[in-house]
């Protein structure tokens, strides 16, 4: 009927509207056309001009339609007509508010609205009636009557009847009042439903909530629809309605609404715990819904949500969003009733809308979409934005409204768990106000306004209280609609009194205090643990509140009152939530969900508060009381430990100037420095970025901290500005970090906490810290300060003393006052230090870092916590939290930063707020005090009831102590490694936990785990170098604790102490430490006697091994514990030694752990050396040697190798062994021989490489013993019962040595007959030696990682690898040993000293045919030289050299000498020979030299008979003298009778006298017969021959004659030698090969670096610059070897130069098999940078370093930067002239001995043991090199290559020709 088509002729339509002749329906049609086509301003003028006719048109049409509906019922056309009529009615109300205000058509409009509001109408008509009624009521305002107010009070069904003058009223009674006079003739017209509801119409289940939503929504959106001429009336219209709402509805919605909520004068009473309500369950749509029986709870939620809508970001919808698929969607009012309103849950006000519904069975009018779109309950149209903003402005316009809103929000915090979702909405509002956009009432008031403010004005809260307390309204209602009730009366009754309170600025602090107090109610509601869903809801709400708390802590500036309120609230919350009930079931789940977050928030808030304001002692006491009562919560311990980590990082930075994330020791290697220099300034911004992103990693590590997505506001979740803000945070964090680093440098000058070695007087301004920290102790013991408080200190400081009194009841750090005074007293800077600090701070205050950092810091738009909440996906490992965490939640707030800058600049002598001063933020005193207080905030940790929690605390204490120790290690570290800084003035309190630890050891056994942690920390604490020596009281307590622990029956306690108390404890030399030696021995023995696999067996044996030298040093060591199986207490040094060695002997044979067995064997070796060096002649030395000897045949080759190394060590003590027992050195060799013979059969066929290598080690050890023992010992017959029985001749030891060597070369089955008997283990059996001593097995370690074939292929070719593997290791080694013995036994060392082993003579020396001084090809053309190959293994050069003539005369003939140069696997040797038998006439004159000895350097053994060998008298028996001389020069050639060869042999023992006579007779008879025969021949002329004359001798002239003669004498020219004797091809390649072979070493070589570190040296420059050391150091270096002159040294140089650039001398040690050169730093010049560089190059390139350190701190490997140094042996001199040894090695280096890590040795043993250990360490390192070869293996390969490539194969004739004439270019005579 009424279409929306355009009417072009507006004027025509106007005329028709105003034409009274037209029917009212036609006029309505044209009026509707005008409404659609005319602007609102023109319409208002039109309506005001023609108001009467317009109302007539409306009313007539309305009455007509009403009658039609009553008669005909409703249909679609009538509903459309009703829509049009009501639309006109709405426009009348909108355009004519001024007339309506004066009650224009008052009764008619009222009657019409009653018809629409009739409860019998359909829901849609009733909603439309409410909307139009609110328009009318807003227009009437003060001219409304009581009936209109009562109708408003009854619009929402479900509330109690409103009391009036006629009694209780409802909407029904108000629409159709009952007649007051029963017999009256005239009655008011009965109002009936206009459009009754039909059956099937969907009705909201909770009509109260539904109509309340309608009412609240229309109160807002209709507030601005009236076209007032005075626009201000729009505000008054809403205020009028809202006042009525608060009067009639609010008391029912909020029965506990109070006037006390006043942010202008807040009442901050902390709430109490509320019991949980009774929850009822309703199941709807398969979903369980929980509610309470609290009246009007759902309506209360609706109202709170409505209020929240004005303060949260709203979702405005445009007109296009209200259509779907191009078709108009159903009106929102229909959608709401049909869909959303039937739900129990109230829909979100900022949601996206509800679903469509079916249009059937609906009596609702099809109102136009333009009007219906205003009725949405789920979203806010764009056109309503202004009206919502207007209402928001109104709600914040006066103090009364502000207090009202905050009280409503307080009521939201009181909601039960089932409705707590709206509480989270309120939390979002507060979050927006506090953290983002502050409302006007949070702005700071003007000072003038504050001064003039009337304290009595309490705003709306007071008037509301009057309403609540007044009589029940007392309305006197009349039947007429007179002006008996007006807006003026409402004002006089206190409904609206806000106008006088328009100054709403209260300041942020008051608002924060009110929020803190109200928000606590969320936590203080008893949780419903029976319903998990409700529990989760409450937990989520609590976390949302805590998020704001945390952001406030981090980002806001709060005054003291606000801080105190926050701390009290957090304490109350924590105490209420975390206090476990007696049944331990009710609150556990709720408390557990909040525990970590709540504890962390509380502690962080406490720390931040103390940095910003003064916190009273009473609050600290409450803090201590609450947390110490909650120690059963594991979460508390976790958060406390995390906070302590962060505080420790701050303490390190502010007090000690150390950054825990950038420690000096972590960046000292030169490689890292180069990388940093290469990256330049990129590092700092990157670090800042990382810090900015991970603000508080320990909070971020908890997933329950992150705010859920549904809590986020629309402005921050995904907003474009957020990422930009985060980048700003990162940038500013970098700048702040840079400033803080500079600040910490300045603060380092003013550090305090624990004194170092030099006392510095305290200043009066900070000495109060000492008083407060140590004012009381737990036992009531008063701690006295070394300095009294100054009388001039500020009063505030004096009043604030003793904040932590009760804290120390738990932390009993002091045993008594005298306990370690230097450590427990606080140290403060002097006034002079203050002055320096002030100057430095002033200079820094003008720097760019501080100016930029702090000026920009205040601009941070997004806090770190917000970053966490917004970005939960950004996760960072929790192990990196320490300092980055502290850098954020412990940094100053932005506004505090500038204040700090000023205070630091102007008040440098002041102290922190916590110390009574004015400085905020982190300073040395605040950091130390807070660290100390938070440490003790748990109370006495030994009072914790839970053993698990107790153990966790002590476990963390160990971690905390480790951090403090790390800080100490990083103090006074040279950053550039160029100079050593002075010792630190302040050191961390490493013994601070002592009293806790001591007490923990006395706890019952149920606290065992904590006790073990305490023992572990005690050991770590007392095995560390003590900067300040503990006093006697402390030591007595410590020794008592250790004694009780070491004698404990608990095996775990023993294991813990032994594992963690290293031998360093003995090296510290604490007073009285020796009293624990016996306890340690006993405890270690008990640990070793157990079968526990986890027992610290290696540590126990290390302890025992470190004590082997103590009994000789400390002559009487008491044993405080009786020895098992001995009733008396053992005392005295000898008994202790016996006790100790018996344990070592037992474990050296029975220990199952491989490493421990090795340590036990090494310990025995050290003890043997100690006893031999001290000449103690202890009887158990033999037992120790027996164990070591038996271990040689142990299946585990690692253990056996250690035993072999020990035997090799004893080589240098053979003389001491001989003094101990004459046969003992020979016994060593016999053991080796028998062991080799025992192991050889299995080893030579074994596929395991270690078996073969061990045989090689035994062979080399045997060689060392053979070379060390005198020849007489080796020639001594082996005397054993078995051998004497089988072999009466008793072969010498050397014979058995050669036999076993021959077995190694030829195979173990070589000697199987009795005549070739080899020494066996059974032959060694005697009373002193048991070769079959039983040995227990050990658990093998991880197998050695062999190099793969691919790795080998990368190093050598396949052919070379095959060649290397073709060399048989055992036979080759045995051949080398035999060659070595043949050449050197009895000769080494030569006259040139031990440095010369092989010959230095070559073929060109003394060669008349060669002019060059070096070996060259000219040598091969010499006629007097020939080169041969013998047995395909040896190169032999024969050279004929001219002999010198007799002195002072000429010789009859010039005889030549023969020189034989031999090159084999053992080395190069030279022998000179002379003609022994020749013509008498050509006998040479006495020679004044012995060229063979002088040239080759052999030692010349002079013997008496030898000198007269060729110069006896005529007729002397020269042969007789020769035979006699052989007995002197070569005793091994003598017969077993030891008679000279020229002496008659004694009579054989088996021959008697008769037999002897018979033999003599036979011989004489034969002699007589021979003489007779000769006589007969002489007499017979037939047998006579012609006599020949003696030929005259001819002098040989051939250059190779005598060489050829020698070859003939040696049988080399015989046929049987022909296959083993060959010539070499003489060419340039051979020459190069020979030179290369001669350059190879003939001994094992090692180069060892030696460093000297003096006291206070911690940089390489200082260490390398040392030119001399202490006397003990010089004595040690002298004991390492012989000091050799490098310019003339002939042995191994190790890279040192002869020109003096690397020093003039160096220690050198050598045997016939090993050479060691020591690169001693103090021997090398350091006068220039080049010298230092060269020195470092030589020292750093060595694999093994010896470090002699006299510094008070442990040596760090990084001080000497080198990629080598695989093994470092550090020597620390002790006070008792003993030396503590630590060995650090790379993990891949295998075990080596004889010294081990932790050994303690005496000065006599030190050089030899260090030297032996260095050699073994060098061998261990070299064995890791792929395809590493020993010197003889290398020589064997070279020899093999020479022989294969240069051996010349020829016929015998050619061979003889070459031997006859080596060089055919020379013509030789036939007689040569």
Swiss-Prot record:
**Main subcellular localisation:** cytoplasm
Stored InterPro entries: ARM-type_fold, Rap/Ran-GAP_sf, Rap/Ran_GAP_dom, RGPA/RALGAPB_N, Tuberin/Ral-act_asu
Q: In which tissues is it expressed?
A: Highly expressed in lung, liver, testis and thymus with lower levels in brain and heart (at protein level).
Give the Phosphothreonine positions (modified residues).
715
Which controlled-vocabulary keywords does the entry list? Cytoplasm, GTPase activation, Phosphoprotein
Domain Rap-GAP: residue ranges: 1634-1842
Checking Gene3D superfamilies in the record gives:
Rap/Ran-GAP
Per UniProt, subcellular location reads as:
Cytoplasm
Q: Which SUPFAM superfamilies match?
A: ARM repeat, Rap/Ran-GAP
According to the record, the residues making up region (Disordered) are 446-481, 711-730, 758-849
Biased composition of type Polar residues is found at 775-795
Could you tell me what this protein is called?
Answer: Ral GTPase-activating protein subunit alpha-2
């Amino acid at each position: 009927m009424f279409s929306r088509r355009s009417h072009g002729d507006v004027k025509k339509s106007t005329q028709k509207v105003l034409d009274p002749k037209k029917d009212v329906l036609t006029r309505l049609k044209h009026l509707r056309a005008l409404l659609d086509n005319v602007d609102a301003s023109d319409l208002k003028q039109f309506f005001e001009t023609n108001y009467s006719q317009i109302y007539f048109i409306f009313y007539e049409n309305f009455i007509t339609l009403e009658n039609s509906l009553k008669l005909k019922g409703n249909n679609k056309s009538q509903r459309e007509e009703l829509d049009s009529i009501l639309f006109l009615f709405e426009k009348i109300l909108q355009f004519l508010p001024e007339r309506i205000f004066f009650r224009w058509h008052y009764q008619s409009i009222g009657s019409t609205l009653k018809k629409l509001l009739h409860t019998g109408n359909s829901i849609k008509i009733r909603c439309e009636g409410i909307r139009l009624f609110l328009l009318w009521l807003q227009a009437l305002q003060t001219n409304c009557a009581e009936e209109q107010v009562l109708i408003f009070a009854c619009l929402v069904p479900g509330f109690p009847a409103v009391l009036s003058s006629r009694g209780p009223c409802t909407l029904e009674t108000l629409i159709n009042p009952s007649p007051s006079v029963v017999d009256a003739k005239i009655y008011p017209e009965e109002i009936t439903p206009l459009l009754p509801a039909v059956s099937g119409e969907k009705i909201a289940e909770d009509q109260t909530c539904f109509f309340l939503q309608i009412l609240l929504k229309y109160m807002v959106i209709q507030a601005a629809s009236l076209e007032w001429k005075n626009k201000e009336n729009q505000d008054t219209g809403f205020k009028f309605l809202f006042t009525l709402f608060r009067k009639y509805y609010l008391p029912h919605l909020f029965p506990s609404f109070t006037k006390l909520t006043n942010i202008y004068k807040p009442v901050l009473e902390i709430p109490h715990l509320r019991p949980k309500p009774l929850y009822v369950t309703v199941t709807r749509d398969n979903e369980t819904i929980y509610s309470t029986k609290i009246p009007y709870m759902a309506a209360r939620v609706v109202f709170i949500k409505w209020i929240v809508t004005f303060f949260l970001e709203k979702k405005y919808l445009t007109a296009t969003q209200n259509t779907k698929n191009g078709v108009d969607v159903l009106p929102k009012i229909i959608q709401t009733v049909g869909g959303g309103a039937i739900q129990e849950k109230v829909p979100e006000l900022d949601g996206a809308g509800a679903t469509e519904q079916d249009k059937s069975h609906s009596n609702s009018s099809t109102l136009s979409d333009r009007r219906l779109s205003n009725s949405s309950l789920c979203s806010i149209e764009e056109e309503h934005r202004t009206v919502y903003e207007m209402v928001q402005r109104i709600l914040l316009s006066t103090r009364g409204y502000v207090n009202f809103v905050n009280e409503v929000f307080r009521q939201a915090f009181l909601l039960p768990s089932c409705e707590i979702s709206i509480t989270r909405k309120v939390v979002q509002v507060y979050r927006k106000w506090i953290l983002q956009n502050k409302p006007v009432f949070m702005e700071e008031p003007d000072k003038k306004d504050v001064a003039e403010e009337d304290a009595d004005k309490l705003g709306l809260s007071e008037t509301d209280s009057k309403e609540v307390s007044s009589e029940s309204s007392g309305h006197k209602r009349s039947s007429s609609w007179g002006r008996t009730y007006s807006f003026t009366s409402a004002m006089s009754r206190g409904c609206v009194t806000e106008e006088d309170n328009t100054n709403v600025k209260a300041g942020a602090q008051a608002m924060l205090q009110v929020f803190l107090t109200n928000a606590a109610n969320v936590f203080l509601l008893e949780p419903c643990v029976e319903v998990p869903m409700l529990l989760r809801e409450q937990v989520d709400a609590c976390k949302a509140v805590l998020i704001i708390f945390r952001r406030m802590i981090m980002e806001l500036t709060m005054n003291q009152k606000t801080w105190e309120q926050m701390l009290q609230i957090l304490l109350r919350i924590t105490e209420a939530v975390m206090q476990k009930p007696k049944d331990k079931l009710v609150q556990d789940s709720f408390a557990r969900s909040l525990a970590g977050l709540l504890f962390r928030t509380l502690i962080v808030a406490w720390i931040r508060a103390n940095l910003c304001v003064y916190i009273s002692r009473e609050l600290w006491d409450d803090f201590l009381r609450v947390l110490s009562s909650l120690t059963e919560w594991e979460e508390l311990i976790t958060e406390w430990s995390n906070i302590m980590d962060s505080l420790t990082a701050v303490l390190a930075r502010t007090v000690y100037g150390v950054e825990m994330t950038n420690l000096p020791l972590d960046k000292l290697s030169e490689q890292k420095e180069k990388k940093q220099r290469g990256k330049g300034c990129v590092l700092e911004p990157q670090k800042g970025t990382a810090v900015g992103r991970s603000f508080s990693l320990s909070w971020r590590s908890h997933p329950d901290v992150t705010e859920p997505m549904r809590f986020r506001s629309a402005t921050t979740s995904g907003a474009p500005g957020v990422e930009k803000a985060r980048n700003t945070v990162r940038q500013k964090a970098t700048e702040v970090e840079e400033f803080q680093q500079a600040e910490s440098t300045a603060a380092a000058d003013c550090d305090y906490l624990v004194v170092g070695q030099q006392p510095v007087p305290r200043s009066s301004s900070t000495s109060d810290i000492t008083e407060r920290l140590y004012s009381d102790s737990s036992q009531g013991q008063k701690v006295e300060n070394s300095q009294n408080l100054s009388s001039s200190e500020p009063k505030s400081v004096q009043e604030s003393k003793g904040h932590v009194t009760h804290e120390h009841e738990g932390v009993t750090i002091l045993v008594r006052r005298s306990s370690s005074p230097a450590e427990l007293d606080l140290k403060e800077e002097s006034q002079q230090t203050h002055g320096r600090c002030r100057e430095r701070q002033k200079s820094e205050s003008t720097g760019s870092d501080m100016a930029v950092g702090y000026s920009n810091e205040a601009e941070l738009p997004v806090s770190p916590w917000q970053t966490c909440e917004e970005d939960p996906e950004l996760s960072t490992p929790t192990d990196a939290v320490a300092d980055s965490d502290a850098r954020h939640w412990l940094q100053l707030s932005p506004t505090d930063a500038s204040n700090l800058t000023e205070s630091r600049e102007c008040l440098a002598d002041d102290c922190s707020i916590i110390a009574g001063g004015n400085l905020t933020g982190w300073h040395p005193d605040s950091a130390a005090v807070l660290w100390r207080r938070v440490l003790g905030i748990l109370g006495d940790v030994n009072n914790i009831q839970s053993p698990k929690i107790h153990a966790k605390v002590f476990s963390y204490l160990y971690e905390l102590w480790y951090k403090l120790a790390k800080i100490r290690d990083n103090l006074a570290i040279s950053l550039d490694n160029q100079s050593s800084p002075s010792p630190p003035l302040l050191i961390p309190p490493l013994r601070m936990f002592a009293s806790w630890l001591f007490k923990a050891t006395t706890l019952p056994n149920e606290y065992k785990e904590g006790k073990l942690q305490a023992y572990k920390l005690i050991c770590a604490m007392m095995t560390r170098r003590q900067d300040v020596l503990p006093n006697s009281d402390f030591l007595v307590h410590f020794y008592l604790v250790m004694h009780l622990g070491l004698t404990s029956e608990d095996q775990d306690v023993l294991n813990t102490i032994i594992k963690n108390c290293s031998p360093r404890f003995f090296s510290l030399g604490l007073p009285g430490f020796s009293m624990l030696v016996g306890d340690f021995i006993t405890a270690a023995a008990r640990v070793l006697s157990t079968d526990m696999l986890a027992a610290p067996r290696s540590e126990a044996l290390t302890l025992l091994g470190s004590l082997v030298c103590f009994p000789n040093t400390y002559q009487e060591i008491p044993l405080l514990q009786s020895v098992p199986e001995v009733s008396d207490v053992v005392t005295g040094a000898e008994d202790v030694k016996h006790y100790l060695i018996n344990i070592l002997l037992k474990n050296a044979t029975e220990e199952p752990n491989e490493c421990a067995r090795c340590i036990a064997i090494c310990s025995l070796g050290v003890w043997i050396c100690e006893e031999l060096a001290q000449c103690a002649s202890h009887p158990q030395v033999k037992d120790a040697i027996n164990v070591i000897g038996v271990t040689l045949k142990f299946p585990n080759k690692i253990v056996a190798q250690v035993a072999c190394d020990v035997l090799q060590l004893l080589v240098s003590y053979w003389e001491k062994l001989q003094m101990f027992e004459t046969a003992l050195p020979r016994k060593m060799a016999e053991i080796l021989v028998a062991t080799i013979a025992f192991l050889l059969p299995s080893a030579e066929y074994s596929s395991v490489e270690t078996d073969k290598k061990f045989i090689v080690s035994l062979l080399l050890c045997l060689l060392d013993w053979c070379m060390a023992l005198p020849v007489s010992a080796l020639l001594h017959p082996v005397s054993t019962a078995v051998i004497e029985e089988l072999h009466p001749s008793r072969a010498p030891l050397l014979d058995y040595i050669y036999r076993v060597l021959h077995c190694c070369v030829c195979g173990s089955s070589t000697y199987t007959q009795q005549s070739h008997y080899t020494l066996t283990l059974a032959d060694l059996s005697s009373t002193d030696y048991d070769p079959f001593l039983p040995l227990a097995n050990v658990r093998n370690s991880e197998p050695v990682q062999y190099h793969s074939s691919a790795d080998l292929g990368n190093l050598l070719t396949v052919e070379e690898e095959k060649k290397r593997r073709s060399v048989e290791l055992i036979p080759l080694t045995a051949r080398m040993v035999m060659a070595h013995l043949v050449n050197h036994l009895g000769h080494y060392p030569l006259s040139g000293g031990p440095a010369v082993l092989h010959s230095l003579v070559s073929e060109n020396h003394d060669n008349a045919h060669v002019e060059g001084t070096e070996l060259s090809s000219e040598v091969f053309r010499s006629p007097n030289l020939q080169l041969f190959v013998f047995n395909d293994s040896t190169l032999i050069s024969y050279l004929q050299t001219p002999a010198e003539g007799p002195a002072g005369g000429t010789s009859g003939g010039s005889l030549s000498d023969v020189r034989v140069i031999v090159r084999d696997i053992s080395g190069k040797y030279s022998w000179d020979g002379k003609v022994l038998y020749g013509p008498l006439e050509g006998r040479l004159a006495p020679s004044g030299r012995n060229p063979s000895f002088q040239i080759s350097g052999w030692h010349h053994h002079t013997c008496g008979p030898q000198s007269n060998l060729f110069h006896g008298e005529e007729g002397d028996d020269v042969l007789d003298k020769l035979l006699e001389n052989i007995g002197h020069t070569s005793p091994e050639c003598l017969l077993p009778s030891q008679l000279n060869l020229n002496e008659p042999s004694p009579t054989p023992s088996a021959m008697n006298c008769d037999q002897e006579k018979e033999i003599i007779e036979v011989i004489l008879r034969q002699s007589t017969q021979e003489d007779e025969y000769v006589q007969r021949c002489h007499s017979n002329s037939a047998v006579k021959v012609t006599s020949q004359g003696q030929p005259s001798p001819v002098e040989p002239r051939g250059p190779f004659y005598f060489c050829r003669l020698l070859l003939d004498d040696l049988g080399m020219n015989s046929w049987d030698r022909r296959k083993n004797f060959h010539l070499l091809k003489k060419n340039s390649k051979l020459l190069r090969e020979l030179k290369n072979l001669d350059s190879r070493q003939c001994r094992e070589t090692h180069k060892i670096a030696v460093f000297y570190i003096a006291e206070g040296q911690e940089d390489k420059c200082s260490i390398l610059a040392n030119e001399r050391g202490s006397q003990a150091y010089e004595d040690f270096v002298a004991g390492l070897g012989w000091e050799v002159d490098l310019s003339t040294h002939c042995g191994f140089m190790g890279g040192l130069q002869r020109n003096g650039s690397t020093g003039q001398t160096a220690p050198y040690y050598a045997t016939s098999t090993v050479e060691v050169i020591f690169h001693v730093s103090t021997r090398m010049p350091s006068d220039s940078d080049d010298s230092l560089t060269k020195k470092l190059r030589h020292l750093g390139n060595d694999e093994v370093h010896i470090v002699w350190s006299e510094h008070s701190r442990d040596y760090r490997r990084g001080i000497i930067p080198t990629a080598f140094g695989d093994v470092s042996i550090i020597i620390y001199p002790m006070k008792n002239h003993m030396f503590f040894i630590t060995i650090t090695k790379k993990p891949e280096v295998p075990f080596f001995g004889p010294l081990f890590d932790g050994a303690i040795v005496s000065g006599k043993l030190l050089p030899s043991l260090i030297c032996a250990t260095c050699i073994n360490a060098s061998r261990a390192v070299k064995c890791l090199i792929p395809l590493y070869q020993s010197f003889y293996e290398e020589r064997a390969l070279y020899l093999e290559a020479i022989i294969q490539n240069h051996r010349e194969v020829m016929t015998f004739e050619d061979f003889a020709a070459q031997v006859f004439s080596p060089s055919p270019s020379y013509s030789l005579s036939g007689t040569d």
